Amino acid sequence: LQVKLMKKLTSVLLGAALIALTPCAAPAANPIKVMILDGESGGTYHKWQLTTPVLKKELEETGLFQVDVATAPKAGEDFSNFKPDFAKYQVVVANYDTANWPDDLKASFESYMKNGGGLVAVHAADNAFGHWPEYNKMIGIGGWRDRDEKSGPFWYFKNGKLISDDTPGRAGKHGRRTPYQLVTRDASHPIMKGLPAAWMHQGDELYNSLRGPGEHMTVLATAFSDPANAGSGHDEPVLLVTSYGKGRVFHTAMGHDVNALACVGFIVTLQRGTEWAATGKVTQKTPANFPTANSVSYRNDIAEMDPLYKNGLNGLDAQPGAGRGPARPGAVPAAK
């Protein structure tokens, strides 16, 4: 669809906020040093080559962050020369999904986190390292890569309370990409303070049936996983934080592709979550164009960073409302 048509449809059908461009803020005198870690995915469906530049742009436009990218070797390749100096950075943003690391690299990252480092796990990063116990403590919950009841319980909200469920079974499911509503569960946390009680996210995968140790974990926001779309029927954690030693972790299950990363809700929570993971504080204000309970807010300048943007519907989700272009939220299930 052409941009004019997309704007017209969005305005008429959704009232979603579309922005042509967001100007960058002036750089901070002492910017937060960020490493984006990428280089591997569990499959071709997570295109880190496309999403890393988007994450970098979204962080740098705040003026708060100085961002470097560390691209790891692919699984099975030689890691002998991949020795990132984690201590140079206040926070590592993991846009990364691999099965394992050499023991010395795992020990280096564990030490970094225990001594006050920060981690932001984005979408596919909660699929990574299924057999690395310390990483699973860091991210709280995860899916796929052989995770099952040995990895920890399922976690979800029911009747307003966080439930740990020891039912046996494999971890990690999702339906087709579609818009969904997030419900804030901890409005007092710095990342969530000032955000709406409920808000719509642009078309994305909604992970369900995640499991893990859940140690020192606070769920910030959930979304209802609709059984009609291969869902669990539960309010599933989408945004959460944990602590690991002296380190802080922000985990977002959103962000499958550039389309999802173009959601203003994703952008704002990424920016705020990265600042919090690095410093324990959030200084950023809630923008006026933040999504509402019934409409998405969508950045065309971000979506256009995907070379497939002009193709319209995402072929992996051959159903209207599930692909690229403005989301089309239908009736939103009430949080339970």
Where are the language model's segments positioned?
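Helical hinge/lid and interdomain linker segments adjacent to catalytic or ligand-binding clefts
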Residues: 29, 33-36, 40-129
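Catalytic beta-strand/loop cores that center a nucleophilic Ser/Cys/Thr
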Residues: 60, 66, 88, 156-245, ...
